[in-house]
Amino acid sequence: MQTIQLIIFVAFVLSRAAASISSFSDPTSIVNINHDANRLSRALAAGQNQTQRSLRQHEGEDRGAIDKADEVVSKMKALMGTAKNVPNNLAALIAKRSKTAGEFVRRPFLVSKLSKRYNIADQLSFSTLKQLDKIDNMRIVDIKNGIKGNKKTPNGMRRKIKHFEGMKTAPQKFLESHVGRDMQRYGKDGSRWLSAGVVTRTTDQGERQILLISSSNPARGDFLLPKGGWDRGEKIKKAALREVMEEGGVCRAL
């Protein structure tokens, strides 16, 4: 039933985009608005059967819901590519609607999948949900391979990355952490003083993102700010920046 509703929704998106430039008196006749609209209308009309084939539900196939949704969105994009004479503004509109349709389809499945670990999954953005899904897939592999960080060696908390072309590596002093807490500051009550950095960025879509570090234990779903001990002899800003580079792998200036 969900797949059928998806088909109706995607078809509605296309019909709204087509209706902005042309109207149909019947399945074969076309009312022209302008020359560009005429060419687009012929392309869409010619691909009518193809549209139906692309969106038809595959009977008897046992596939995951997200896989089915992704396939429909991929076929929608391929279908859009057949209309080569689409005006730029209309092409942008169709692309935007297609992206929105993809989010509309995938988001409920990601929320359902991730809610088992994150009880606020329904409040997160689509971009965050996709990142969490990717991390959870990596987590499964790490648990299977027995990968877990340790603080007994200077580089025990760093994941080994095979060198690749164009890879940039931070200076060695930022790749190894100080072992032990003998150099760290403590309060009069014995509590350990910590430093933490808040790193944000704005995507091309205007979305504000914040850098969080996953737990060194892959079995836990915690995400924290890049934080660590505040060593004696250094200012708090320097300590925070050091932790951002050591734990977050991000080079930033204050």
Curated annotation (Swiss-Prot):
Compartments (UniProt record): Secreted; Host cytoplasm; Host nucleus, Host nucleolus; Host nucleus
SUPFAM superfamilies xref list: Nudix (SSF55811)
GO molecular function, one term: metal ion binding
Superkingdom: Eukaryota
Gene3D superfamilies: Nucleoside Triphosphate Pyrophosphohydrolase (3.90.79.10)
EC number, UniProt record: 3.6.1.-
Domain Nudix hydrolase: start-end pairs: 191-254
Domain comment, as recorded: The RxLR-dEER motif acts to carry the protein into the host cell cytoplasm through binding to cell surface phosphatidylinositol-3-phosphate.
Family to which the UniProt record says this protein belongs: In the N-terminal section; belongs to the RxLR effector family.
Name of the molecule in the record: RxLR effector protein CRE5
Organism: Phytophthora infestans (strain T30-4) (Potato late blight agent)
Gene coding for it: CRE5
